[in-house]
Amino acid sequence: MEQWDHFHNQQEDTDSCSESVKFDARSMTALLPPNPKNSPSLQEKLKSFKAALIALYLLVFAVLIPLIGIVAAQLLKWETKNCSVSSTNANDITQSLTGKGNDSEEEMRFQEVFMEHMSNMEKRIQHILDMEANLMDTEHFQNFSMTTDQRFNDILLQLSTLFSSVQGHGNAIDEISKSLISLNTTLLDLQLNIENLNGKIQENTFKQQEEISKLEERVYNVSAEIMAMKEEQVHLEQEIKGEVKVLNNITNDLRLKDWEHSQTLRNITLIQGPPGPPGEKGDRGPTGESGPRGFPGPIGPPGLKGDRGAIGFPGSRGLPGYAGRPGNSGPKGQKGEKGSGNTLTPFTKVRLVGGSGPHEGRVEILHSGQWGTICDDRWEVRVGQVVCRSLGYPGVQAVHKAAHFGQGTGPIWLNEVFCFGRESSIEECKIRQWGTRACSHSEDAGVTCTL
């Protein structure tokens, strides 16, 4: 019995060594969830994912099948060795059992029963091994299918969330593109409006500049005419004062002669006879001429102070008065800093060339170290007055155009100079630009100043 138990344990050990791993592809594909019907793109992605998963399974099977074959061969070799050992042990037992009585029938029956029992035990062991392998395979594949199903569901959930987020981002991008298109259209409209507004503003500014230039010309002309009228008024006032003085002298002489004649008439005495009878009243004669104005009577007493009248309009600006007497010399100032030692004599930037004297000639101006002429466009009295005043003359007598004092040889520096007549030099007037090519030296301007 001990040998029987030892043989039975060895048989169980040899059967337990023959274990193998089997994979069922149909069960795996059956456990996969159906295709989701979200959108064509998602279905295509899922199909591609399925194909990749199947390819991965095939690759795993292609790698594992040779390994399983090699392991099975090794196991078969080891199993055959164990089986040969167990068979030798069994033969030894049978020989030991049958050695006592080869001719007895009980031994034959025992051998037959033993063989049947051994075959039944082998069938049961094989059935148990098959059941164990199937159970292990089903549990392994169930766990694997559950994990793969869970992972696949997670992947589907992630894909659905990703697809929803992509759709949300796509909708946001569409809205942003629409807003950008509307913003672009509004910007284009705004740009067109700005361009139209700029064009209108430029037209209005150009018109206003033309109107301002016309008004400036009118103001210049009016100011020149006013200055000329003021000068004429001064001359007329001086002439009228002289005439009034002459008339006063004449009236005084006439009054003196009249008084002398009246005195001589009073001294003449005539012999008169007796008065005759009064004659008839004659007709009224014509009104005689008014007599000479009598001498002014004595100044009467001052009257009462009247009420203060309303403030009158401001009068015109009077002529500049004569220079006053020089004041007393002030206190001595502080000692200044030492200079560089170079003394520069002041020089004028305007000169008159080609005239009969220094007070008249062609006007030339110094610019950039070179003397040049001035074109006679808009050359008027007020510009000549500024030129004469800058040269130290009291006023202008006449302005000349068309190279009256001859043509110059240098560059033509200025053209269309605008002055009010109150500037101290021609550089303070309105100058468009230095250097012009729109004129020639046949249009050089000149001036004659008053002495």
Curated annotation (Swiss-Prot):
Changing D174Y: Found in patients with prostate cancer. Residues 77-451 are extracellular. One of its GO terms (biological process) is positive regulation of macrophage derived foam cell differentiation. PROSITE patterns: SRCR_1 (PS00420), SRCR_2 (PS50287). SMART domains: SR. It comes from the Eukaryota. Changing H441R: Found in patients with prostate cancer. It is found in: Membrane. Residues 171-255 form a coiled coil. Residues 77-109 are annotated as: Spacer. Changing L254V: Found in patients with Barrett esophagus. Residues 350-450 form the SRCR domain. Its main location: membrane. Residues 273-341 form the Collagen-like domain. Glycans are attached at N82, N102, N143, N184, N221, N249, N267. Changing G369S: Found in a family with prostate cancer. Isoform I, isoform II and isoform III are expressed in monocyte-derived macrophages. Isoform I and isoform II are expressed in the liver, placenta and brain. Disulfide bonds join C375-C439, C388-C449, C419-C429. PANTHER family: MACROPHAGE SCAVENGER RECEPTOR TYPES I AND II (PTHR48071:SF16), SRCR DOMAIN-CONTAINING PROTEIN (PTHR48071). Homotrimer. Interacts with MYO18A. This is Macrophage scavenger receptor types I and II. It comes from Homo sapiens. The gene is MSR1.
